[in-house]
Amino acid sequence: MIHNETIRWPAPAKLNLFLYITGQREDGYHELQTLFQFIDLCDYLTITPNLSGKITLTPNIEGLALENNLIYKAAMILKTHTAANNGAHITLEKNLPMGGGLGGGSSDAATTLVALNHQWNINLTKDKLAEIGVLLGADVPVFIFGKAAIAEGIGEKLTPAYPAERSYLIAVPDCHISTAAVFQAKNLIRNTKKRTHLQLINQNWLNDCQPYVKKNYPKVAKVIEWLIEYAPTQLTGTGACVFSTFNSINEAEIVLHNTPDWLAALTAKGLNNSPLNELLATLK
């Protein structure tokens, strides 16, 4: 029996507060140590379950075939765990930039899995959902669990973490960076010494992708050079988005008001418990 109600689900963005590349495996995947924290900037998926057996999505992302959309792929994978006639109509409000390092596609996929698990009344555990999610992307599980975490391995080994919930200014450079291209780069840092969690939390945080991205993407370098005059600034993920850290949202807003015309930017609050988790808790 499905839950018939229409629900608007958040799919929050994330920041990588640090990202270290500690090696590369024989299969080409990179060994990482990174700290994920959510922010209060979200895509939204409004989902109405039905018994049509079909998944419909409005609007689909321009230039992307429906079968390649992570929302659609997540729903179709989950359908194999439920009655064949279960379907859903999904409406996407896309607020997160694509290819920005904020995890938008992975978060959308995770929200789809969590939402349909509830609305189709499948009741898989989060551990099982994460096993499904990692098939769609290495960082999908962190969005499913919805807790700030240190991720290791290729990103699938998660340990809960409790970084300060700071305020951020997030800048969106006018360029797209391919994650695959960054990780395939010959001069990418790949030999950072692996650290204990205590060492990771108690040191200055860096992103090993940043030197390569700054050198090869002048628009990102320009943003970092401008923002670092105001506050500690670094790349999130492989970019292109850049974030600066502030003690209060008011401090971040002051810098936002000084943002030059050539730069899109916004402010956000760090969250150790995701908005998706908070909504799910009210539905049980």
UniProtKB/Swiss-Prot annotation:
Q: Which one of the record's GO molecular function terms can you name? A: ATP binding
| InterPro entries documented for this protein | GHMP_kinase_C_dom, GHMP_kinase_C_sf, GHMP_kinase_N_dom, IspE, Ribosomal_Su5_D2-typ_SF, Ribsml_uS5_D2-typ_fold_subgr
Which cysteines does the record link by disulfide bonds? Answer: none
Annotated residues for binding of ATP: 97-107
User: What does the record list as coiled-coil region(s)?
Assistant: none
Q: In which pathway does it act?
A: Isoprenoid biosynthesis; isopentenyl diphosphate biosynthesis via DXP pathway; isopentenyl diphosphate from 1-deoxy-D-xylulose 5-phosphate: step 3/6
Tell me the protein family, please.
Answer: Belongs to the GHMP kinase family. IspE subfamily.
Q: What does this protein do?
A: Catalyzes the phosphorylation of the position 2 hydroxy group of 4-diphosphocytidyl-2C-methyl-D-erythritol.
The protein's name in its UniProt record: 4-diphosphocytidyl-2-C-methyl-D-erythritol kinase
Gene from which the chain derives: ispE
